[in-house]
Amino acid sequence: MFNWVKTAMLMAAITALFIVIGGMIGGSRGMTIALLFALGMNFFSYWFSDKMVLRMYNAQEVDENTAPQFYRMVRELATRANLPMPRVYLINEDAPNAFATGRNPEHAAVAATTGILRVLSEREMRGVMAHELAHVKHRDILISTITATMAGAISALANFAMFFGGRDENGRPANPIAGIAVALLAPIAGALIQMAISRAREFEADRGGAQISGDPQSLATALDKIHRYAAGIPFQAAEAHPATAQMMIMNPLHGGGLQNLFSTHPATEERIARLMEMARTGRFD
């Protein structure tokens, strides 16, 4: 229920932001257009954002015939978590990573790169997929996927402002300084939204995944491997769609500077330390 409230609040906040930006770009007419655009985006994000994200990554659905070991692993973990079987996807990328998407546990999907399957052992891979199923169980996936598409829309709106400027209701050029401010601040607003919803969520998914698999150490060693391998392998699809970075088990972006200020994930070292403490004590609280 709490995630439904957060999702509704996020949609309302994004709608308000769109209206403000629309007003800065085009006055009252811009506000009206922005409101209609935001309502359309809200509808689209709820029903179709998961399909959009999977298409961004050219994810291919697999089954027990095409990826038997991986598919059975997900099915076994979903059973342990008392979840419906999600759709399972593979992404042909060398960078090791994984994510979950969908609007609820009944319409969920999990995806992993071919790179992560090569890098991790079967035990470590179970830890990763248990983490992703914990996101499904906690109903994080709707707000995560909506945030990805909304943040992308904010950036698109900022680019529109930068390249096309705006007109007020009398047809005069809008304040160019306002247009520049929108173009600079909108992506930052999108990044702040992602950061606000992501950090605590990853800790909870680590804990929930450890409970599902019963093996927190496997996720800890998996995170360590992913962190080390991913640092040297660019994830082209993620770099092309940075708004989706917060969906991943590990931040796939390699940029520095301001990008580091908007990191969507807790420090890997802290995540590993918490998991190893769970393994040592046998406690998941």
UniProtKB/Swiss-Prot annotation:
Regions that span the bilayer: 7-27, 30-50, 146-166, 177-197
The protein, known as: Protease HtpX homolog
UniProt remark on cofactor binding: Binds 1 zinc ion per subunit.
GO CC annotation, single: plasma membrane
Keyword presence, Zinc: yes
GO molecular-function terms, A-Z: metalloendopeptidase activity; zinc ion binding
Active site: 132
Family recorded in the similarity comment: Belongs to the peptidase M48B family.
Topology term for the membrane: Multi-pass membrane protein
Compartment(s) of residence: Cell inner membrane
Alphabetic keyword roster: Cell inner membrane, Cell membrane, Hydrolase, Membrane, Metal-binding, Metalloprotease, Protease, Transmembrane, Transmembrane helix, Zinc
Main location: membrane
Lineage, broadest ranks: Bacteria, Pseudomonadati, Pseudomonadota, Betaproteobacteria, Burkholderiales
EC number: 3.4.24.-
A GO biological process held by the record: proteolysis
PANTHER family with a match to the protein in the record: PROTEASE HTPX
Protein's UniProt keywords contain Transcription regulation: no
Named cofactor requirement(s): Zn(2+)
Matches recorded under Pfam families: Peptidase_M48
Chain positions recorded as Zn(2+) binding sites: 131, 135, 202
Origin: domain of life: Bacteria
